[in-house]
Amino acid sequence: MRLLLAGCEYAGTTTLAHAIDDWMFEKMGARYSLIHEHWKIPHTSGHPDDTTPDEQAWLLRATPKFMEMHQRHSLYYHVQANTFNGPDGMVVGGHIDDAVYGPMYFGYGGKGQPHDRELVAHQVERTILHFTNDTVIVHVTADTDVIRKRMKDDPHENGIIKEADIDKVKTRFEELVAWSLLGKKIEVDNSGVISDTMAQFEQKIESYLTDTDRSRITTHMMLARQQRWREEGGPPWRRHRGRRDDHSDH
């Protein structure tokens, strides 16, 4: 299952990514080898980000030219051929995060600037489509008041967005999801508890599950059932037959 999660900071993309990973393990018996989330400057390293406060401060002092290059090279790296060797991939933000935050907060990638991020986004997506058309964009939304409360209750270290910009950022994500060449898209509202969001996800992703996904779901269900039968002393019809045989002996 190949997913790109995109949405305003504090909408809950990271939380949802890990919930989907757990759901995939429950349903398919498989997990994502890595969850790639490297595009919210200065959190651009590791799985998850492992940069120190000093390293983050250094990156925040970098020039727009350096930030642009740093992020663009990361985007290109994450769509190289071996990325698509297996059936699964999870990206949080990716080129959509970069196209929102680069021009809005870091001074690069806007219209008329070198490496306009709308154009770079399509370059990245054409590369993805060269290898697979299975990628699904999951547009993660949340009410503005909810995002505002999350910002106050649990602020991110070196977070990006400003409270006054929440609606503008949300609108830009909506525009760029619509702009995307990746044709498979769903939207989930993560304003409430994650279990409700996952219920939306499970319903909406169903039509985009690949043959591999469906095969793994079926196989995992069969294996889980067999394990349950072993623990219970066999399948129900054998247990029932055994009880009848015991009764006939008397």
Regions found by a protein language model. Give the residues of each.
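Conserved substrate/cofactor phosphate-moiety recognition/catalytic segment
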Residues: 18-81, 101-104
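Conserved nucleotide-binding/hydrolysis micro-motifs of P-loop NTPases
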Residues: 39-41, 95-97, 141-147, 193-194
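Hydrophobic anchor at the beta1->P-loop junction of P-loop NTPases
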Residues: 5
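Conserved glycine(s) of the Walker
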Residues: 11-12
